[in-house]
């Protein structure tokens, strides 16, 4: 419970979502949260939300669709490969999210607002420059010219089309 509350307290735009297929667990967490003034405020502002899933599969789909910055999974036996979109994954009760915030070791510059769907946390890879280069041979030119001309025409881009057709 404190992990969800800790993330919700970052700022007024922060949202923590607790997902479980156990209504009893969610009810207990809601009651515990509601017992504190700050918890009441977080619930009122929808900064902490309790979501009941039909089963583990639905919970995993919801999590991957949401792509949280921090994902705490208490089930240590779950196949973590099922989780595909998150900033940082914390596995088991011992893995407090606050440890990752402060001192566990991995970089804490993480994707927010669902950006975990296409990006991971800051790493050395963000400092690489990827350059694209094309060198087309005569055979490739003929094939690509036809395809490019068709696509350019469909988009209504006349000069793209001409750029391709002069190479046929």
Q: Where in the sequence are the language-model features?
A:
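Short beta-strand-to-turn element immediately C-terminal to the catalytic PLP-Schiff-base lysine
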Residues: 18-21, 52-53, 91-92, 104
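Acidic-enriched, low-complexity/disordered segments with a strong bias for Aspartate over Glutamate
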Residues: 3, 11-13, 27, 37, ...
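Electropositive phosphate-/nucleotide-binding environments in soluble metabolic enzymes
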Residues: 1-2, 19, 23, 27, ...
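A broad, low-specificity signal for short, low-complexity segments enriched in glycine/proline
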Residues: 11-12, 33, 51-53, 87-91, ...
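C-terminal core of ALDH-fold dehydrogenases
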Residues: 64-168
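Glycine-rich, Lys/Arg-enriched anion-binding loops that position phosphate/diphosphate groups
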Residues: 36-75
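A conserved active-site cap/scaffold subdomain adjacent to cofactor or substrate pockets
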Residues: 1-50
């Amino acid at each position: 419970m404190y992990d969800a509350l800790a993330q919700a307290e970052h700022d007024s735009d922060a949202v923590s979502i607790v997902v479980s297929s156990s209504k009893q667990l969610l009810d207990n967490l809601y009651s515990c949260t509601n017992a504190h003034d700050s918890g009441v405020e977080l619930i009122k502002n929808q900064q902490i939300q309790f979501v009941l899933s039909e089963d583990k599969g639905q919970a995993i789909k919801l999590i991957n669709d949401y792509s949280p910055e921090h994902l705490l999974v208490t089930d240590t036996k779950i196949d973590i490969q099922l989780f595909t979109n998150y900033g940082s994954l914390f596995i088991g009760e011992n893995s407090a999210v606050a440890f990752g915030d402060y001192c566990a070791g991995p970089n804490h510059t993480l994707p927010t607002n669902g950006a975990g769907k296409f990006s991971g946390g800051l790493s050395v890879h963000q400092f690489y420059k990827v350059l694209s280069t094309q060198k087309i041979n005569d055979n490739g030119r003929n094939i690509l010219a036809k395809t490019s001309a068709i696509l350019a025409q469909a988009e209504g881009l006349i000069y793209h089309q001409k750029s391709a057709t002069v190479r046929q």
